[in-house]
Structure formats: C-alpha cells, structure tokens
Amino acid sequence: MRAPERGALIWLSFTPQSGREQAGRRPALVVSPSTYNSKVGLALVCPITSRVKGYPFEVALPEGGPVQGVVLADQLRSLDWRSREAELIANAPIAVVERVLQLVGALLSSP
C-alpha cells in the first residue's frame, strides 16, 4: 500500500495499547496528509468503533457505507502504517473528515 491520504478509511492494528485506548485490528480515519505519511512513515489516525456511546468527540459515519460506527476524534494516535499493515478500505465523506479535523483542532488549540 502506498502512503494513505487524509480522509482514508483504513484497517490498522492498534495493539499494543494501554488503559482505555482502543486495541486490536480495527478501522481508522487518517487525518494527516499523505506528504507527511510518506516522508515520515507514520500517520495520524483516529480509531473507529461500532460502540456508539454518545460522547461529544464521536463523529458518526453514514449508514450504508463501507465502515459503520463512529470516529473517535479524541483518540488521535501517531502510528507506523507500514508495520501495522494498513489496508485501504475507502475514503470517508468530506463532511466527516472536516468535523473530525475540527474536533481534533479544538483539543489541540489554546483555551
């Protein structure tokens, strides 16, 4: 697989993990640009879960799409997409990507 693009939905291993972090092989949304991903070999990703809890940092994926569930925008991780055997699933809708980036930005910006 070549470097994933921002907005790509990929399969990726989140193991090892610690505490309340998501674990196992699961879908994720890539939020970093492909230029970064290809040069560094890492990608900033948010895991996706099918267990909707109604938390404010969950972003729902549209029903009927290739991946069901919610993107966990508050669980941003930097992972080696090659060693974790990333596989492209599809691209997320632009509205989902924009909302996730907005929430990640809110977490990282000054109060």
Predicted regions and their residues:
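Conserved functional hotspots at enzyme active or ligand-binding sites that engage polyanionic ligands
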Residues: 1-111
